[in-house]
Amino acid sequence: MAAPVLLRVSVPRWERVARYAVCAAGILLSIYAYHVEREKERDPEHRALCDLGPWVKCSAALASRWGRGFGLLGSIFGKDGVLNQPNSVFGLIFYILQLLLGMTASAVAALILMTSSIMSVVGSLYLAYILYFVLKEFCIICIVTYVLNFLLLIINYKRLVYLNEAWKRQLQPKQD
């Protein structure tokens, strides 16, 4: 017996628009965060636009040891290891992945989107803890990316539920 063929299912328009907006914002913030970190490495006195006061300093957080490889990969792979990249590089890859995989309605893509979103929220919670309790800083760029990651988790969960319902309807026997 042949496996059932699923018809093409598309996601709601609001999901595509929301995903595009969140990913575009995430990509732009990741690029800016990368720029801030590079400038801070080049010139330790560099003052970024997001450095608004003594307690609101994104450059301090981005240039800290937790700003590269989540503060973990450097001790595993070495400070100059290829995987010990700025967190903004991982963010850029994540948002591009979310954008590209969001263009397809496949089950595998939906699972990858959901899994990577869960990982990003766990990473965001870890970095938020470091930001508040260890660095004692307020990084507006960091906080906004944490919110974007949480929004993507919600979008991906809604997508998974929507696609699951659509596929179940397709597999139900037709009543004459």
Curated annotation (Swiss-Prot):
Gene3D superfamilies per record: VKOR domain
SMART domains recorded: VKc
GO molecular function, one term: vitamin-K-epoxide reductase (warfarin-sensitive) activity
GO CC terms of this entry: endoplasmic reticulum; endoplasmic reticulum membrane
Compartments it resides in: Endoplasmic reticulum membrane
UniProt-listed InterPro entries: VKOR (IPR012932), VKOR_sf (IPR038354), VKORC1/VKORC1L1 (IPR042406)
Intervals, Lumenal compartment: 37-87, 136-138
Pfam family, one: VKOR
Annotated control of activity: Inhibited by warfarin (coumadin). Warfarin locks VKORC1 in both redox states into the closed conformation.
Binding positions ((S)-warfarin): 87, 146
Residues the record lists as binding phylloquinone: 142, 146
Disulfide bonds: 50-58, 139-142
Protein name: Vitamin K epoxide reductase complex subunit 1-like protein 1
UniProt source species: Homo sapiens (Human)
